[in-house]
Amino acid sequence: MKGKPAVLAQLHKLLRGELAARDQYFIHSRMYQDWGLEKLYSRIDHEMQDETAHASLLIERILFLEETPDLSQQDPIRVGKTVPEMLQYDLDYEYEVIANLKEAMAVCEQEQDYQSRDLLLKILADTEEDHAYWLEKQLGLIEKIGLQNYLQSQMS
């Protein structure tokens, strides 16, 4: 089924974001592992796998709409140097993804591509209710209990 150009443009934009988020989570997870913060490593590695799954869903949809996904393009990533900075960069990225998903869903509605919209709604729910929410909680914990206590709680 041939997709509408406006919808495909949005799907490609989202794919670039998911690939970048995956890579940002990848480097951050390995940094946490290197620092001995095993709980953070495990959670952020899980987030990386979720972003890979989101990218896979977008790739499958783009292919269904008879276009070839471009995996050579992705948005820039921001690598933090401290745990709070890394968590904040990841949260900022999730907020950007949320805004892009909502924009893309509006385009899907306008173009009457309800299947793409429904797919994006599932990704949005995961992004808002899991990824962004968890990151907000971690930054809140750092404020409440202090960075040193937080870091100690993230060791295995």
From Swiss-Prot:
Pfam families associated with the record: Ferritin
Occurrences of domain Ferritin-like diiron (ranges): 1-146
Taxonomic lineage of the native organism: Bacteria, Bacillati, Cyanobacteriota, Cyanophyceae, Synechococcales
Molecular-function GO terms, alphabetical: ferric iron binding; ferroxidase activity; heme binding; iron ion binding
Positions with a binding annotation for Fe cation 2: E51, E94, E128, H131
Subcellular location: Cytoplasm
Swiss-Prot/TrEMBL keywords: Cytoplasm, Ion transport, Iron, Iron storage, Iron transport, Oxidoreductase, Transport
Protein name: Bacterial ferritin
Chain sites annotated for binding Fe cation 1: E18, E51, H54, E128
Gene Ontology biological process terms in this record: intracellular iron ion homeostasis; iron ion transport
Keyword Heme applies: no
Subunit structure: The bacterioferritin (BFR) complex is formed of 24 subunits (BfrA and BfrB) of unknown stoichiometry. The BFR is arranged as 12 dimers that are packed together to form an approximately spherical molecule with a central cavity, in which large amounts of iron can be deposited.
Catalytic activity line of the entry: 4 Fe(2+) + O2 + 4 H(+) = 4 Fe(3+) + 2 H2O; Fe(2+)(in) = Fe(2+)(out)
Function according to Swiss-Prot or TrEMBL: Part of the iron-storage bacterioferritin (BFR) complex which stores about 50% of intracellular iron. Iron-storage protein, whose ferroxidase center binds Fe(2+), oxidizes it using dioxygen to Fe(3+), and participates in the subsequent Fe(3+) oxide mineral core formation within the central cavity of the BFR protein shell. BFR rapidly binds iron in labeling experiments in vivo during iron-limiting conditions.
EC code: 1.16.3.1
Gene Ontology annotations for the cellular component aspect, listed alphabetically: cytosol
Similarity comment: family membership: Belongs to the bacterioferritin family.
Disruption outcome: No visible growth phenotype in iron-sufficient conditions (30 uM Fe(NO(3)3)), in low iron conditions (no more than 36 nM) cells grow at half the rate of wild-type. A double bfrA-bfrB deletion grows as well as the single gene deletions. Even in iron-sufficient media both single and double gene deletions have lower photosystem I content (PSI, which contains 12 Fe atoms), store about 50% wild-type levels of iron, and undergo iron-stress.
Induction / repression: Constitutively expressed during growth in the presence and absence of iron (at protein level). Constitutively transcribed in the presence and absence of iron.
